[in-house]
């Protein structure tokens, strides 16, 4: 087969998604520490599954590879989670970039040449859009596949053989990742993101094996949880009118009125000034535009459309009738800075809500790292034009950075503070002052974190050696700044040794904050607290964190 049609290629993308879904738990375990706490598999699974679900809903409206590329790459970025999800979205953005430009007609097919060139551009765009490309990751997989197809003589005669070759190179690249990243070699694992990308390509290849195996179960709904605040205020953005219409471009009822030439970007810019939840899809071949938006001024939205043509269909629903209509207009955004926080569990979220009256909180245990979409939705909940993202994992940086870029277009100022764990986040919140500026708050929070010492304690799943610390399987280990600082066969000994080390980093340590995980009972936590208070004369606070991986997350100040 020398080409592939649109429907078949969508099936190939879905098979790639399925293969990641089948392997995500194993991908999660390909982490560089002896604890299987990675979430690369979850992040990649959620990223592509949500994009494929959106694609399935829109499939009947997609008539060309160009439309497919625009929709799919857009949704990949919106739903991307963690570094792996964002980087994967950039690889696919590159893959579709030339296809979007060249394959705009209906019933077009992708040739061997199209796909080979797509793999080449995928690498170029991904490396360009990732600020600090690291070899030994999925970027390396994209680069080596690109190099393979740059030579015409390496291009097979069929698409099946081309994907076989791409998958072969991908797995070869995966095997090379430990040689490129010493931390992978020391741990005896390959890079999880590279493995996930290879799984995706292998899934696409399976289309040619004659077994589609399109399992609807892999596309089961994955809901983003915004905690109780989202439930209480789910309807705030629904005030106004849901306005939809189909506009036939250039059509004139009144022949004396001249119609303007339609420019989608300019039109979108105008619509976004008076509406949200905006979706505008144009079909230039058939000369019409579909518009969907939520606005308080539907008459203005209709007037905008009439500048370019006439309506074939109009539908306006009053959303106020479906919600509590005591407020008839949206609340203006406040100037005081607000916090959007990420935490691993509901227990941490509840603590932050109670102590700091912060409600825009995203729990990541079930959904993986926050996507750009989920962060944007959380910002809406703050109702503030000045926002600080408080992130408990540095792997969330790319999503936060992309969100900040998008918020600039909405005239919302945003910055971020990254902590090593949720205990550091809770500590940083003690110096947050909503009467001060974003800049002042971010500076104060970062300074406080530097004076705060924290670590996570868990049980090793394999033997390991790092620097001068020897870890045996099932040892309890303490980790800070991705370095193992203590390893003991008994949990109490590890806890004490961790306190000794952390106390040296803090001037006059007085207070210890500890959150215990699901593997620790309340009774055991109380016993540990009593032992610590007796030995160290520290004021201690032990609380349930309900985290899955870590027995304890502790901080000293």
From Swiss-Prot:
Domain DhaL: 7-206
GO molecular function, one term: glycerone kinase activity
TM helices/strands, residue ranges: none
Biological processes annotated in GO: glycerol metabolic process
SMART domains: Dak1_2 (SM01121), Dak2 (SM01120)
Pfam families: Dak2, FakA-like_C, FakA-like_M
Superkingdom of the organism of origin: Bacteria
InterPro entries reported in the protein's UniProt record: DegV_domain_contain, DhaL_dom, DhaL_dom_sf, FakA-like_C, FakA-like_M, YloV-like
PANTHER family: DEGV DOMAIN-CONTAINING PROTEIN DR_1986-RELATED (PTHR33434), PHOSPHATASE PROTEIN (PTHR33434:SF4)
The name this protein goes by in its record: Uncharacterized protein MG369
């Amino acid at each position: 087969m020398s080409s592939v049609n649109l429907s078949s290629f969508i099936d190939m993308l879905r098979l790639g998604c399925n293969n990641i879904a089948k392997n995500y738990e194993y991908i999660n375990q390909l982490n560089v520490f002896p604890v299987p706490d990675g979430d690369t598999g979850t992040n990649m699974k959620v990223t592509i599954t949500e994009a494929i679900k959106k694609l399935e809903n829109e499939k009947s409206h997609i008539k060309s590879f160009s439309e497919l590329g625009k929709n799919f790459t857009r949704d990949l970025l919106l739903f991307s989670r963690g570094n792996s999800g964002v980087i994967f979205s950039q690889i696919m953005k590159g893959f579709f970039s030339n296809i979007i430009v060249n394959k705009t007609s209906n019933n077009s097919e992708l040739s061997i040449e199209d796909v080979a060139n797509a793999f080449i551009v995928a690498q170029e765009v991904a490396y360009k859009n990732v600020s600090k490309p690291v070899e030994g990751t999925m970027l390396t997989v994209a680069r080596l596949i690109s190099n393979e197809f740059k030579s015409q003589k390496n291009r097979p005669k069929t698409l099946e053989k081309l994907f076989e070759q791409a998958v072969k190179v991908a797995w070869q690249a995966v095997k090379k990742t430990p040689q490129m990243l010493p931390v992978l070699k020391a741990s005896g694992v390959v890079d999880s993101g590279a493995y996930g990308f290879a799984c995706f390509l292998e899934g696409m290849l399976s289309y040619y094996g004659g077994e589609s195996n399109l399992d609807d179960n892999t596309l089961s709904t994955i809901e983003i949880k915004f905690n109780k605040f989202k439930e209480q205020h789910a309807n705030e953005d629904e005030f106004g009118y849901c306005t939809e219409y189909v506009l036939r471009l250039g059509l004139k009822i009144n022949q004396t009125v001249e119609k303007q030439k339609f420019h989608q970007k300019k039109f979108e810019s105008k619509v976004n000034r008076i509406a949200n939840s905006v979706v505008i899809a144009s079909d230039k071949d058939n000369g019409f535009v579909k518009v969907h938006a939520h606005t308080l001024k539907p008459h203005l939205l209709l007037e905008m459309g009439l500048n370019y043509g006439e309506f074939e269909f109009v539908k306006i629903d009053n959303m106020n009738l479906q919600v509590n209509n005591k407020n008839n207009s949206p609340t203006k955004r406040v100037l005081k800075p607000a916090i959007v926080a990420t935490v691993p569990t509901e227990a941490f979220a509840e603590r932050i809500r109670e102590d700091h009256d912060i409600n825009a909180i995203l729990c990541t245990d079930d959904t993986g790292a926050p996507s750009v979409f989920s962060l944007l939705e959380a910002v809406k909940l703050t109702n503030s034009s000045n926002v600080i993202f408080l992130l408990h994992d540095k792997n969330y940086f790319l999503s936060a950075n992309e969100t900040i870029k998008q918020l600039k277009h909405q005239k919302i100022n945003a910055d971020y503070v990254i902590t090593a764990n949720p205990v550091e986040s809770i500590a940083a919140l003690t110096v947050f002052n909503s009467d001060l500026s974003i800049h002042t708050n971010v500076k104060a929070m970062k300074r406080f974190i530097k004076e705060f010492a924290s670590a996570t304690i868990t049980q090793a799943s394999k033997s390991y050696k790092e620097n001068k610390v020897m870890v045996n399987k099932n040892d309890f280990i303490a980790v800070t700044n991705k370095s193992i600082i203590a390893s003991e066969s008994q949990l109490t000994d590890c806890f004490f040794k961790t306190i000794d080390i952390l106390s040296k980093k803090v001037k006059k340590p007085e207070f210890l904050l500890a959150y215990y995980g699901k593997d620790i009972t309340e009774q055991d936590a109380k016993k540990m607290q009593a032992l610590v208070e007796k030995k160290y004369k520290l004021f201690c606070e032990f609380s349930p964190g309900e985290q899955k991986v870590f027995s304890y997350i502790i901080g000293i100040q």
